Amino acid sequence: MMTRLAISGYRSLRDIRVPIGALNVVTGANGSGKSSLYRALRLLADIAQGRIIQSLASEGGLQSTLWAGPEAFSRAMKAGAQPVQGLVRKNPVSLKLGFSGTDYGYAIDLGLPLPDSLSKFSSDPEIKVESLWTGERLGRANAFAIRNGPSVRIRNDNGEWRQAYQHLASVDSMMTHCSDPRDGIELLMLRERMRDWRFYDHLRTDREAPSRRPQIGTYTPVLASDGSDLAAAVQTIREIGDAEEMDAAIADAFPGAHIEVTSSDGYFELEMYQHGLLRPLSAAELSDGTLRYLLLVAALLSPRPPALMILNEPETSLHPDLLPPLARLIAQASKRSQMVLVSHALTLVAALDAEADSRQIALEKQLGETILRDGTPPDWTWPSR
């Protein structure tokens, strides 16, 4: 389980270290940095998919995503006695992402490429350093894999360092190119775990949402990120998952209601039966809030729960009366998967805060920098270039 998250140089996250528990609720005012924290987790997941450079490019490139303030704030700047201004840099420009847990830790350092007038890709960032270690904090004795520039070394079963790569491209991660079942088994295991992280921030409920139409019926243990295969996901839960928990979650939010999946010529369609109505309502007839709740039920009750699930503002379109049932559903899901939830809804935050394993991560801005409002940041060591 992840216990520490560290981000440096990414948007408003100049240098933040966050303690992570089983159920984490990220809160804060608009512009406090919640979305940046969410995006940073997405970038970490993209490393395992080999997409980190492309993902940064889609955000406008490294220059657009880097922290826009000074490298550090002086005491006078923080006290307001001196205007905020840039100083001579002591360290190279970098964007760093990392996390650690009870078993493994990983960190990456991306920076600017050397000037090359012949290349049209000079704005692409380069991977300067990567490191994989055991435990929560990087040290000399617990590192398993180290990447410096194009060189990658991996520690074998005898504790000896082996040269795994000498010419790894600056846009390729050792996570995707150096993991093998022999000496790179730790890289392989962590890569597959990161690939399993699940993000939900764009569950569509608009009139043209695919979940409102009949869908091809096929085994679906994991709901798509946009919810397009809702009917198939619901039927999969009913056949191989916890159908009783799904029915209870529906009844908790809509007393007297239940859902069924109909099949015709290989296509599935979701129907909802509500107390007092003479016929079921199809997904096309459901309100945005009702459909969104059903999508969240299908996501949270997946028969194949991920190691980590991240929900971005799940309360969107939901009536306040649905937030307590949603909180109970999320709390149950956190017993199967580690959860990170970004939310504005005070009712949802308060309901989740009452859970025994819940940890509230309150963010705020100070001189444009995102900081933790409460608590002591965990210890963290970045690998050096």
Residue ranges and their predicted role:
Residues 39-115:
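Conserved P-loop NTP-binding catalytic core
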Residues 11, 24, 42, 287, ...:
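Catalytic acidic motif of RecA-like/P-loop NTPases
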Residues 94-240, 244:
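Electropositive, glycine-dotted interaction segments
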Residues 22-64, 293-297, 347-350:
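Phosphate-binding glycine-rich loops of NTP-binding sites
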Residues 324-385:
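C-terminal lobe/lid and adjacent interdomain/linker elements of RecA-like ASCE P-loop ATPase modules
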Residues 1-14:
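N-terminal pre-Walker A segment at the start of P-loop NTPase domains
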